Amino acid sequence: MSESNPAYGALPYLQTHFVVAGNGRIFEDRLIARTRKKTKGVIRKQVVDLRWEGGQIADRLNGDSNLKSLLTTVLLEEGDIRIDPTENGIRIYGDWKPEYKIVMSKQALETYNAIAGHVKSYLSELTRK
């Protein structure tokens, strides 16, 4: 076997992305954000506090108490959630997971939908100005 070809193939890790249409690169500094969570417990881990950090969208997301209550249950299964603007859209995604753990709960889908709603409304406000 050649030194340049590793003995393994592609790793079976996947990441779920949700995309909001629009040119996010124009407002990149305002739209980039991620969650930071504080957990307690080892065996029965739970999220005790969380906050969004990043651009101005983080302030809007921090102000939504309904989203915060959804995130306290979802962040344990999804890991940190990030918002990343690109030229063709704004990506919303969680951590990498092994392919056998790719399961989307109803609460996770509601959470991503709520985040996408905030991003979409904020992006429309920015483009109207």
Language-model features: locations:
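Charged, low-complexity intrinsically disordered regions
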Residues: A7-Y13, A21-K129
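Short N-terminal edge-element motif at the start of the domain
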Residues: M1-P6
